[in-house]
């Protein structure tokens, strides 16, 4: 699959305030916090990413109210930057759920009291206890290529995202979920992709409603994923971005959203000044842990770092990365790095697994290994992203 990118350039005025927003100042911040209990598994992360995009390729067709219109949501950093979640409040009175914020999908679903097999540690939303809940009558079901799945019913309710109150948001209440979801530290998923890939067609995403209900006046959200070496955590800012979190100016990149994703073109890859790949397409996906590359690109990168193929989508790599040059991608008119300290994803004794791997596609998935080193502002209304190295 190849993306056909928008040919016209999108030009945005860059402002210098610490927290940037539209003139009316409406935005919401969601901070990220840290969870040290999660353990990484590179093979599972690769399989999850492959299964996720296999599914979409097969498809046709705080509780207080924010007054300034800025949504700030902190997110928790699972063990060593593996995955991140933010807290969202649903219902009246509200129940706080830990959700995986995912730019690679578009559904808002979570464990509910109707679920017959949801994880015992998951917080479960009870529609019978919310005065603002309304039944929808439709059902939903998600099946992934690795055999995992979830299903349930649709409804609507009030959703508070970083202090901004979304009315009549469509929610997906899980009645059943596979064991892969039961054992995770999150209660569900909040999709930040485009509405063309919602499981039930015609459903408005939370970002759609933030814009249409006038809760944010600047149709963007800024993503900062903290690194464990800097204390972990991170934040999502809906309606703006935090210019203190990145260095220099933002580079504007056109997006191809024809498949419902934030698709960009990577012009090339280099290591230590030597070019190791030509151009390829990539998806910016906060819901994927690793940097998943096309097979040929991954092989060239692995060779440059002396990594060996494990033939399961992962590479074994030296645990001592002190002599490694950064992995550099040319995107638009700028270059963006994955530094040496991010090239190791998983360590087990003296053996290490690389933060990059490969899938079965001719495009890349730029997951958290890339995103925790580069600040990204997503604009779904005039589809483009803006990227800058983290400060």
Swiss-Prot record:
The disulfide bonds in this chain are 115-118, 319-352
Question: What Gene Ontology molecular function terms does this protein carry?
Answer: aspartic-type endopeptidase activity
Q: Which PROSITE patterns match?
A: ASP_PROTEASE, PEPTIDASE_A1
Which residues are propeptide?
22-68
PANTHER family registered for this protein in UniProt: ASPARTYL PROTEINASE, BETA-SITE APP-CLEAVING ENZYME, ISOFORM A-RELATED
Task: List, from the UniProt record, the residues annotated as the active site of this protein.
Answer: 102, 285
| Limits of the Peptidase A1 domain | 84-388
Is this entry keyworded Hydrolase?
A: yes
Q: One Pfam family from the UniProt entry?
A: Asp
Q: Which GO terms describe its biological process?
A: proteolysis
At the top of the EC hierarchy, this enzyme's class is hydrolase
Tell me its family: Belongs to the peptidase A1 family.
* Signal sequence bounds: 1-21
Spell out the protein name for this chain.
Rhizopuspepsin-3
Q: Which UniProt keywords apply?
A: Aspartyl protease, Disulfide bond, Hydrolase, Protease, Signal, Zymogen
| Catalysis performed (reactions) | Hydrolysis of proteins with broad specificity similar to that of pepsin A, preferring hydrophobic residues at P1 and P1'. Clots milk and activates trypsinogen. Does not cleave 4-Gln-|-His-5, but does cleave 10-His-|-Leu-11 and 12-Val-|-Glu-13 in B chain of insulin
Q: Which InterPro entries match?
A: Aspartic_peptidase_A1 (IPR001461), Aspartic_peptidase_AS (IPR001969), PEPTIDASE_A1 (IPR033121), Peptidase_aspartic_dom_sf (IPR021109)
The protein's Enzyme Commission number: 3.4.23.21
Domain of life where this protein originates: Eukaryota
